[in-house]
Amino acid sequence: MNPASPFATLTDRIDWQKVDGLVPAIVQDFQSSQVLMMGYMNPEALQKTLDTQQVTFFSRSKQRLWTKGETSGHVLQLKNIALDCDQDTLLVKVNPIGPTCHTGTVTCWDGDAQEESQMVWLHQLEQLLAERKNADPSSSYTASLYARGTKRIAQKVGEEGVEVALAATAGDKEELICESADLMYHLLVLLQEQGLAMNDVINKLKERHK
């Protein structure tokens, strides 16, 4: 962490007396915005998180610092951290390496209790498409597309774009939805093949919206 970073003074801004020395830290996937878990940090845990760029908590049961993934390898790589307006809660945005929950699930919350947002699902689809990049071409349609390279994938994006336009021109809404899904899928594959992600596109849209 750069000493000149605004995060360097974060520890001093927290109202530690108000939180009895342990500040709640809500952990969120920086790409999908899915809430992954909640833990507690004392000043030492927060400082270690900032210094190592891996999320560390204070374990209330073990009464010691605990770096997430220290035994499983499923660490939480720090991407951003923010203090709320009351100076008593942290929002920690991370890149999770593997499942976050000790049960092996992505999040520590019950899947039925946490409604899955479209962006979370889209991110999970991107992860699946990324995994298929090095898979046997005979194992799936996606893997076979990667094997045929940029030209073929780009051709499919163009073909599906035409199908979307034709469906819209015909006024067939159901077909428009289906063809749009095909277009989105092939576009995501193309982005992955080029080392990009939907977040790159969203960030460009945000930039243009300013």
Swiss-Prot record:
It is found in: Cytoplasm. Residues 122-210 are annotated as: Phosphoribosyl-ATP pyrophosphohydrolase. The keyword Cytoplasm applies. Residues 1-121 are annotated as: Phosphoribosyl-AMP cyclohydrolase. It is an enzyme of class 3 (hydrolase). Keywords: Amino-acid biosynthesis, ATP-binding, Cytoplasm, Histidine biosynthesis, Hydrolase, Multifunctional enzyme, Nucleotide-binding. It comes from the Bacteria. Pathway: Amino-acid biosynthesis; L-histidine biosynthesis; L-histidine from 5-phospho-alpha-D-ribose 1-diphosphate: step 2/9; Amino-acid biosynthesis; L-histidine biosynthesis; L-histidine from 5-phospho-alpha-D-ribose 1-diphosphate: step 3/9. The keyword S-adenosyl-L-methionine does not apply. One of its GO terms (biological process) is L-histidine biosynthetic process. Its EC number is 3.5.4.19, 3.6.1.31. GO terms for cellular component: cytoplasm. GO terms for molecular function: ATP binding; phosphoribosyl-AMP cyclohydrolase activity; phosphoribosyl-ATP diphosphatase activity. HAMAP family: HisE, HisIE. This is Histidine biosynthesis bifunctional protein HisIE. It comes from Vibrio cholerae serotype O1 (strain ATCC 39315 / El Tor Inaba N16961). The lineage of its organism: Bacteria, Pseudomonadati, Pseudomonadota, Gammaproteobacteria, Vibrionales.
